């Protein structure tokens, strides 16, 4: 009877929490995690109450759970660090679903598809799924490429020493001025970047909306 009534109460609490979360501005991934936590935690509490009701000493249950928890914790140390990492990512929000990120330790990069409890899933530009453990991700430096609304495109063009630099700059500037994705409020920069052994590197800088970055870069390089 205690289990039946208790589980009904837990289900009701979960439904109420779900309605409250839906009316809030809380991130969807965080909502799912918290609802799971409430549901599992509530059921564990109900079972604990039911067992103590039938005469098992609470101290015995606590001791048993403590021993089991210690053994489980040692065997799942890596998994627990990933869960903790997932919680940190959900709370601090260094990125969200749809952002393009670069993980500092391994250099893996891609668009965030999902932030799970154990792993974060990225989709690379060549359509590969990359699964990064949350424990690693929460302890690494993260570059969030899409954090800002606009992004600078940096390109290098090599020319021969015999070329007229002023003429090259004029041609390149005209090319970038015609680029449809360019943010016209931002200046175009054409400059001598470096002198190589057999060529001169001409640098190009201009700004685009973040979502237009790759298409614009590829279009200009063509």
Segments predicted by a language model, with ranges:
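Hydrophobic alpha-helical membrane-association signature
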Residues: 83, 171-172, 216, 220
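Membrane-contacting alpha-helices and adjoining membrane-interface segments
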Residues: 1, 16-91, 125, 129-150
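Soluble accessory domains appended to multi-pass membrane transport proteins
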Residues: 88-184, 207
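Solvent-exposed, non-transmembrane regulatory segments of membrane-associated proteins
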Residues: 163, 184-222
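Generic recognition of well-ordered alpha-helical segments
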Residues: 15, 170-174, 222
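Short aromatic/hydrophobic contact patches that present stacked aromatics
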Residues: 71-73, 154-158, 189, 201, ...
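Hydrophobic alpha-helical transmembrane segments
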Residues: 1-14
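Glycine/charge-rich, flexible interdomain linkers and switch-proximal surface loops
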Residues: 38, 62-65, 102, 185-192
């Amino acid at each position: 009877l205690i289990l039946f009534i208790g589980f009904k109460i837990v289900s009701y609490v979960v439904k109420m929490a779900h309605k409250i979360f839906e009316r809030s501005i809380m991130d969807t991934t965080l909502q799912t995690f918290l609802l799971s936590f409430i549901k599992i935690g509530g059921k564990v509490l109900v079972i604990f109450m039911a067992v103590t009701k039938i005469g098992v000493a609470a101290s015995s249950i606590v001791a048993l759970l403590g021993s089991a928890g210690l053994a489980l914790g040692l065997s799942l140390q890596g998994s627990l660090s990933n869960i903790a990492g997932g919680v940190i990512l959900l709370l601090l929000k260094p990125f969200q679903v749809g952002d393009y990120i670069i993980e500092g330790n391994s250099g893996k990069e891609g668009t965030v598809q999902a932030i799970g409890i154990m792993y974060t899933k990225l989709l690379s530009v060549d359509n590969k799924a990359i699964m990064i453990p949350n424990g690693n991700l929460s302890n690494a430096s993260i570059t969030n490429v899409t954090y800002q609304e606009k992004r600078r495109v940096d390109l290098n063009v090599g020319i021969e020493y015999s070329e007229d630099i002023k003429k090259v700059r004029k041609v390149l500037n005209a090319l970038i001025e015609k680029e449809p994705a360019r943010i016209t409020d931002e200046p175009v920069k054409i400059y001598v970047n470096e002198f190589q052994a057999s060529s001169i590197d001409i640098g190009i800088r201009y700004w685009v909306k973040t979502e237009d970055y790759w298409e614009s870069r590829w279009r200009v390089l063509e």
